Amino acid sequence: GNAGPNNVASAYAVAGFTQYACDVTPLMFCLPSPSYKAEANKGKMIRLRTGGNGAAWAPGAFGFLDPNKIKVDPDGPCAGLNGVKLDACLLGAIGGVTQCFNIRGVDIEPGQKVGIEDAIFNIRFDIYKSIMNGKKNDPDYAPAPNVIKGIVPKGGGSCIGQNEEISTDTVGLPRDDCFGDGTCDRFGTGVWANGRDVYVNTNYGGVHPSAAAAAATTRSAYYLAEIAAAGGGGSSSDILSGLSETGRPMCSNNQSADPDRRVVIAAGIDCAAHSIQGAATNVPVKEFFKIFLTEPVGDDGTSPPQLDIWGEIIGTAGGLGGGS
């Protein structure tokens, strides 16, 4: 199959001592506390920011699992690649990782890394620019079946590329309300009622697209309901009607049928307990988190760039700190 790091994860124990997680996105982030668990924080938003460059890893900082330690699928899109091209493939392509990561110890790298740009992540949202511009019609780099994001190509056309502007009649999924009023920093509360109202009023004239959407309490559930209401992941029927965005990919001529194209699996690490600075080896993983990307990744324009990944916790992808 073509199941990849962003749409499948599994965990298993070997001889009762060591647990592994397989086919995960090579991402890691620092937990706010040792007791922070995915299942207890479903529906809450996290803001992951580039971390680890010559400084202590703070809660909410993200980095990467060392790509040189990853066994690449010899039949997948990442075969034979190295350097930035390998990074881009492991983070952006559908399929390509066969390595199982030992939960008792992974090697990590800082998130601020030459060549790692927002473009690598944002192909999932039908945004193809910079080093990913040539991938827009490559099925291995297809966007998700729902790419509502509240931004559109500047000056018309179907591809955002390097030129984007805020949509005047659509909005992307909102952040937790506490981020807007400044009462939370990196880890949200899961309350997005105000943003939800704006989202439904702007995109749907105040009428939910389905009963499932009306009943959805999380952004990921709403996203899935939108896809289902428009005929599913394999359909090209518009999600939004008569607006600047259809909700379906308009730049790429491909579309992943799998809604999990906007899901990443990230290793949650208790960075404070291990006094990690910069790159580090053999760092224990508390748990692998499934995270739904709610909006395109932000890039501050520096070199190498600082990135912001906004996502909603879906639940656990396995781990829980070791043997079972």
Predicted regions and their residues:
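N-linked glycosylation sequons
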Residues: 1-324
